[in-house]
UniProtKB/Swiss-Prot annotation:
Protein name: Endoglucanase
UniProt entry keywords in alphabetical sequence: Carbohydrate metabolism, Cell membrane, Cellulose degradation, Glycosidase, Hydrolase, Lipoprotein, Membrane, Palmitate, Plasmid, Polysaccharide degradation, Signal, Zymogen
Recorded name of the encoding gene: egl
Organism placement in taxonomy: Bacteria, Pseudomonadati, Pseudomonadota, Betaproteobacteria, Burkholderiales
Keyword Transferase listed: no
Range of residues in the leader sequence: 1-19
Assigned EC number: 3.2.1.4
Species, as recorded: Ralstonia nicotianae (strain ATCC BAA-1114 / GMI1000)
Amino acid sequence: MHRCMPLVAASMAALMLAGCGGGDGDTTLSTAAATDTTTLKTAATTSISPLWLTIAKDSAAFTVSGTRTVRYGAGSAWVAKSMSGTGQCTAAFFGKDPAAGVAKVCQVAQGTGTLLWRGVSLAGAEFGEGSLPGTYGSNYIYPSADSATYYKNKGMNLVRLPFRWERLQPTLNQALDANELSRLTGFVNAVTAAGQTVLLDPHNYARYYGNVIGSSAVPNSAYADFWRRVATQFKGNARVIFGLMNEPNSMPTEQWLSGANAALAAIRSANASNVVFVPGNAWTGAHSWNQNWYGTPNGTVMKGINDPGRNLVFEVHQYLDGDSSGQSASCVSATIGAERLQDFTNWLRSNGYRGFLGEFGAASNDTCNQAVANMLTFVKNNADVWTGWAWWAGGPWWGGYMYSIEPSNGVDKPQMSVLAPYLK
């Protein structure tokens, strides 16, 4: 799951997307059509793990409609009760203080059947991989809050924000860079204040200056330190989701699991209660989740994930071209998107997890437009395990990139008309 396109803009023609290169290596995918590619027909059902969204801060009043399960606490320490009507986010109301001396929140368990998030990746802050850390405004750029507003007005309630770990933390186990943190928090604060959710995406492919997480150069403890610092910065914002990493690849799946669990432990030790999105190995491809060409399958290893806060979603990426790399203007068939999601959907339901389609995209042509529509219909029809999706991509420096939906001089890109029915 990997896409690589030149960034074409008047002053930025020399830039290339961070991480450009070889695709996910699987070119022998079956494209046999299912009987019905927009609904799921197989997989044994188990209880789906709840997803928790914050509804009140410590000491605040809140109201729930109907009878709901609400929990009170922080990080990995919680007490829960079934209730209706009005409550107080206090130890007195819940009968126990699960985390003494720590600022707590109240979260409500989200039901299944409705997609929570629909949005877009706004690229730019991850650009300039060959110029790390690079010069802001020359090698990379953060999108503007106005750009996010355009997508909000289209009905998108989530922005995925790619950025580079090396810029935010220039030295492992040391403080976050003040200037980069200011850019990041400025965007996050403006966009979340306007009502959208921001998915933070360290766009590093499980690497730091080219060294893989879990190696002697980048031990799991350093990765955990990074996430502890980021979680501490954003734990007070209920509209921030932590995406652990963009597209881990070319490493043992077990090694990635170890790093992911270290990051989750660090996030919860910082008393952050935010939702966390967890990718798999092999560019986190949905189509290859249970395949073994990259080593032990994600579908086997990632069942060992351990979130002390019990508030995670598995993030997968899925493109529609022949090798699922997202580097072609063609799509295999009108049904290929739904077909490639089905096995992962079965896995989610069989194991009680929830998923998010963190990247997908296509050029605008008849086959691809129908493939995108069928894929999104499939996700919508399986919302008991799917939580939403984010298109790849928007952002200010794309120029003529074939998957971009960034408007040009105020004019919508053609793909927006395909997405529009799914934003209502």
